[in-house]
Amino acid sequence: MGSMAQKSVLMLCGEFMEAYETIVPLYVLQAFGVSVHCVSPGRKTGDKCVMAAHDLLGLEIYTELVVDHLTLNANFDGVIPDQYDAIIIPGGRFTELLSADEKCVSLVARFAELKKLIFTSCHSQLFLAAAGLLTGGMKCTAFESMKPFIELSGGAWWQQPGVQTLFEITDCVKDGSFMSTMGWPTLGHSLKVLLESLGSKISSSKENHQTSLLFLIGDCVEDYSINVPFKAFQALGCKVDAVTPTKKRGEKCATIVHDLEDGRQLPTEKFGHNFYVTVAWDDVSVDDYDCIVVPGGRSPELLVMNPKAVELVRKFVEKGKFVAAIGMGNWLLAATGALKKKRCASSYGTKVAVKVAGGEIVESERCVTDDKLVTAASTSDLPAFLYALSTALGLSVVF
């Protein structure tokens, strides 16, 4: 899996950008060989932008929770639009500030002039309105509070038909070189459209077989280590489910994000987006899936105390299925025998567990594949993890 001619994408960033709408496309594109430059006006390489999670937490409007930071890897002033295949603008409050910034609006307008792909999400459609790009009835969707401004700007509001709730929305709309989404709940499908729009070919080595993955989670699962691979494998056309022993289909699991703040030995834990269980425990059959994935966070510590969870992983191992873990996910795998005599990646938090379970830690590698076991040390290793696990499952993305 790889890229014959490397694609390059620009991501326009700012304070309080939506974390999920930033990290998911960033890591997925990086996993499949796309270069992504993250920039913000007035800031340079190495500077940081605060990211926030936006979710419905029982109030009439979404709640904003500061979660962590993104480190910029390029300079805004050095951007040459001709050198990129697309621009991605996540949602979040920074869009209100930067959509009034002449340099940012001109940048977006230049991408439109070059007919480069412009990917907007949630509230970042403000840039399209500011640049006068919606005139003539261009089809556009966004978070519903944006509807009046899209229509006042000459755009044609598009909404996925037949949905009753916000979280039933899974689709996006593309009109020419403009692509818009309601927000992070739609990322599985919108990433598929994004990859295809960049010229990718997604294929599987197994003809007439839909690859299927089961994510084993619980409360305090790490936000990115469930959301990034879950949406990534949806984008690759896989059947993807999430299950937990103690909750029904449609119920929520709280997620957490670990943010390493200056001067601290360990990261600060913060709440992230809620994640919805997609399948009931009693409806899960090991034979229906090719792989089980145990994300990180503190949920593995919860699951290791539940005999049902331990036995489920053990059944995947016994049946020769693929088993994968991220970060603290090794904690649960250690209790199932999945790590015995296996090479694996490990964070400091699971080194003792891996060793006493008979595993071999590969200190020099952040993501390791050993036969049908794929492990990543931390969430920052998710691009490598996505590449390794998709390759192991016979999936390829070629540009």
Curated annotation (Swiss-Prot):
Keyword hit for Ribosomal protein: no
User: Which ranges carry the PfpI endopeptidase domain?
Assistant: 7-199, 211-394
One Pfam family in the UniProt entry: DJ-1_PfpI
- Which Gene3D superfamilies did the record assign? 3.40.50.880
Keywords from UniProt, A to Z, are: Repeat, Stress response
| Cellular compartments per GO CC | cytosol
Range of residues in the leader sequence: none
- Report the function annotation for this chain: May be involved in oxidative stress response.
Kindly state the subunit structure of this protein. Homotrimer.
Q: Family membership, please give it.
A: Belongs to the peptidase C56 family.
Q: What is this protein called?
A: DJ-1 protein homolog F
Instruction: Give the gene symbol.
Output: DJ1F
